[in-house]
Amino acid sequence: MNQNFSSMIDQYKHQQLRIGSVSPKQIHAWANKILPNGEIVGEVTKPYTFHYKTNKPEKDGLFCERIFGPIKSGICACGNYRVIGGEKEEPKFCEQCGVESVDSRIRRYQMGYIKLACPVTHVWYLKRLPSYIANLSDKPLKELEGLVYCDFSFARPIAKKPTFLRLRGSFEYEIQSRKYSIPLFFTTQGFDTFRNREISTGATAIREQLADPDLRIIIDRSLVEWKELGEEGSTGNDWEDRKIGRRKDFLVRRMELAKHFLRTNVEPEWMVLCLLPVLPPELRPIIQIDGGKPMSSDINELYRRVIYRNNTLTDLLTTSRSTPGELVMCQEKLVQEAVDTLLDNGIRGQPMRDGHNKVYKSFSDVIEGKEGRFRETLLGKRVDYSGRSVIVVGPSLSLHRCGLPREIAIELFQTFVIRGLIRQNLASNIGLAKSKIREKEPIVWEILQEVMQGHPVLLNRAPTLHRLGIQAFQPILVEGRAICLHPLVCKGFNADFDGDQMAVHVPLSLEAQAEARLLMFSHTNLLSPAIGDPISVPTQDMLMGLYVLTMGNRRGICANRYNPCNSRNYQNERTDHNNYKYRKGKEPYFCSSYDALGAYRQKGIDLYSTLWLRWRLDQRVIASINREIPIEVQYESLGTYHEIYDHYRVVRSVKKGMLCIYIRTTVGHISFYREIEEAVQGFCRSYSYSYGT
C-alpha cells in the first residue's frame, strides 16, 4: 500500500478493500518513486539487509532507505538532519545518499519490487483448489505443473516466426531423444532463440496460454458444450453419466471464472508474475533481543533466497555466453520454487526449514489462520463498550434475555448511569457520579436496571461463521462473574457450557439499536438461514431433564391394582423419608395444580407420586370419554357414582349427569404442563400485541 493509496482511503472514507490480482504496471506504480534528482528507485537487487559493521541498511537491499524511506524521521543515511515540511527551499533529499527527508512511517507502506529474470506462476492460482489456471486453460493440473517446473515443453500454438522443427502439442522434456537433441546443442543465446521460435516451457508457456484466448469466446464455447452435454441425456452407463456430470460442473465453474475476470477487469495472464512485490520493511522487521542478538522475520530469509536465485539466473542469461540450455531451465525451476516457498511454504510437499529444523512462515502462514493478519490483527481488535466473560446456563431466563454480571454491566453502561444520576439531581458533576458508582450505592443499581430495560446488547462468539454467531438480547443483572445464556440459543452460536467465552457489545446509535431489535433478537431467529431447519432445538441434557421430570409411574391404574406382583404389598402402609404416611391404594386428590405443587413444596408428596387432579370439563374430553368403556364403576349412597378408567375417573350424578373429571398424573407432569401453557400464552400475547389484534 503506497502513500497515495492510503491517502485515498482517508479522503474518500472507503469502507472496504478488495484483494485480487494486479498488473505489473500497477506494481511498478506502487513501488517506483522518482527522487528529486530524477533518479527512479524501487527495485530491490541485493539480498542483503544490514551491514555487519555499520549496522545500516545496505543500498538496494531489502531495507534500503532510498527505496523504503529513512529509519528515523528526517535523518538520512549520512546522519544529516533536515526539517520535514520546512518552508525553506532546501532539497528534500540528501544529494550524497539519495534518502528523502520524510517521516519514517513511510516504511510501513512503501513497497519495493524484484524484477524476475523469468516469469513465475503464482502458486495460489495453480495449486490451490480449485486451480484457477487449470480451470481457465482447460488442461489437467498435472500437465500444467509439468510445464511450470520444466518437466514438459509445449509447442507454440501460433507460430509467429519461421520454425525449424515441426513440433505439435506438448511433449515430455525428460525423454532421452528430446533431452539430448534440443538444449545441449545450443549456447545460451542460441537456446533462447530456439525457444522463442519453436517451444515454450515454464511459466512462460502458462502466460502465453492465458493471454491468447478471449474470455468471451471461452464463455460462449463452454456454454455450447454444456448445452450439448445436457441434450445427450443418460447413456445407461453410470460411469459415463458421472463423467458427463463432472464435465458439466467444470464448464459451469469455468464460465463463472471467466465472467469474474471480465467483471473485475482482471487479465488472466496476471496470475503469472513478472514483478514480485516486496513488503514494506516494518511488516517484516529485524529486531534485537536481549544481548543484542538480531531476530529477523522469516519473510526476509525467503526474499533473500528468491533474490539469490534470480540474480544467478540473470547472470546466466546475460554474462555467460556458453551456458547450456539445460542449466538455464534448471535455474528457472529453482526461481519458481523459491517464489512458491515465499508465497506458500510446503504447498508442494516438504516445507523449507531453517538450521534449527523450524518451518519458515510464508505469506500464507502470516495471513491465514486464527493467529493470522486478518483474524488476530484486523478482526481481533478490542473496541469500546464491550466485554468478555465465560458463559453459563441460565435455565430460568427467557429466550430473548441474557444475564450480565454486575461488574460487566456497570462498566458497559457507566456513561448512561452517569447521565441518569445527573438528570435526577443525584450528582452535580461527572466526578461525583463516578464516586457514587465506585462506592456501589443502591441508587446506582436502580438506575442501571432502568437503563438496561430499554437497551439491548449483542452477544458474539468467535468464530462468527454465519449471521447467527452474533445475536441481540435483553440484559438483566445477575450475580457472579459469568454471562448467563438460555440453552436453546447455543446451537446458533455453536457454543456449549464447558468454558466457552463470549463477547458482549453495546449498540450506541439509534440505527444500531433498531437493527438489533428488529433483526437480531434471538427469539426472532428460530430457523437456520441456510436450510430453514429449526435452530433453537432442545439439547440432550434438556431432553434428559424432561424425561426425568415426566417419567413417573407409566402404568395405568388397572396394571397397578390387579398386578399379582403388587397385590401382596397393596394394603401395606409405607412411610417415606419425610415421615409422610399414605397407602398405595389411596392416592391423594387435589382440586387444582396449585394445591399439588404446594404439597410437593411442603414435601408431602414427591416428584413421581401418582395423584388425582381435578380437571376442567371440555367437550373434546367428554366426547372421548363417551367412546370408552370404564374399567370399574363405584356407586355411592347419595346418587353419585365413579367411572374409573385407566388414567382418569369421572364423577357422575344420576340427576345432573357429569359432575367433574379427575386425571391420574404426577407432579412432574403438572410442572411440565404449566411451563408449556405459560409459554403458549406469552407467545399469543406477544403475537396479538405485534399485529394489533
From Swiss-Prot:
Matches recorded under Pfam families: RNA_pol_Rpb1_1, RNA_pol_Rpb1_2
Chain sites annotated for binding Mg(2+): D496, D498, D500
Main location: plastid
Annotated keywords: Chloroplast, DNA-directed RNA polymerase, Magnesium, Metal-binding, Nucleotidyltransferase, Plastid, Transcription, Transferase, Zinc
Protein purpose: DNA-dependent RNA polymerase catalyzes the transcription of DNA into RNA using the four ribonucleoside triphosphates as substrates.
InterPro entries listed in its UniProt record: DNA-dir_RpoC_beta_prime (IPR045867), RNA_pol_asu (IPR000722), RNA_pol_N (IPR006592), RNA_pol_Rpb1_1 (IPR007080), RNA_pol_Rpb1_3_sf (IPR042102), RNA_pol_Rpb1_clamp_domain (IPR044893), RNApol_RpoC1 (IPR034678)
Source organism: Nuphar advena
Places the protein is found: Plastid, Chloroplast
Protein name from the UniProt record: DNA-directed RNA polymerase subunit beta'
